[in-house]
Amino acid sequence: MVYIQDNISVKDIFDNIEYYTDLFLEHGILIFKKLNPTRQEEWDLMKSFGDRIGWFPNSTVKGEPRLPYLSTEDEGHQTTFNRFDHAILADELFIDWHIERAERENFQTGALWHMRKFECNPDSGQTGFINMISFFEHMPKDWQDFLIKCKVCSLSQPNELGVFTDVEFSESLPQRYIVISHYSNKKPIYRPSLSTTDFLTKVDDLPPSVEDLKLFEEIRQWTIDQTVDSPNNQTWFKWSVGDTMIIDLSLMAHAVKGGFNLGERSFSRIWAHRYSFDIIE
């Protein structure tokens, strides 16, 4: 479930930060219509949430807003537009379904996105979500028990434009557990690669058996059917100028639809990570 709040100020959030932190942990995403925070308020909000749920930036991160937490340029999707030689319609995917940086150890656990420019059709550029904690909870129990023991690697890797291309398996490819514990509430999160292919490498730290491989492939296909190919399991949000979203990227699979042109839609971004990038002395 996506939580949407209207008619609220930045001060209201700070004055009730415990309440909104609890809502965030419950829903995985908070959307504040027409909140329109300043850039300093964006930074302060993310640090305040970080103090309570355990991501960085938080109050231990001193100084001005900065990389790698802050994106210094607003996102207008120039790189994504460069991938296409044709217009992407409003009912087509502009950015495929994915879980942010599933392959990284210090993956992005959260983000604040503030739509600063939106000069396209109101139905264009929608962002879709699937809560992968809830998704995992509704899977058969024997599948859950199996997936918790699985390590995988991705057989697609991004190039300099972020376009994924198929690669051969090698031991040097990053490997990860496909189910991890949430950094704050410890609930299990299912984090498959929804737009690329995961390869099963270990089950309970042992090489997978033929039966393991068959079961994993069955679950993988079912997952795609129930996420990417199942609109009924997706929630889509229509943006307007000033809308501000705080999202738990560790658990929210997301995608973006087209229908807009380069320069019509842009938003500011602050990223939260599981671990600090600062050197602690």
For each of these PLM feature ranges, what is it?
Residues 1-243, 251-281:
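Non-heme Fe(II) oxygenase catalytic core, chiefly the N-lobe of the double-stranded beta-helix
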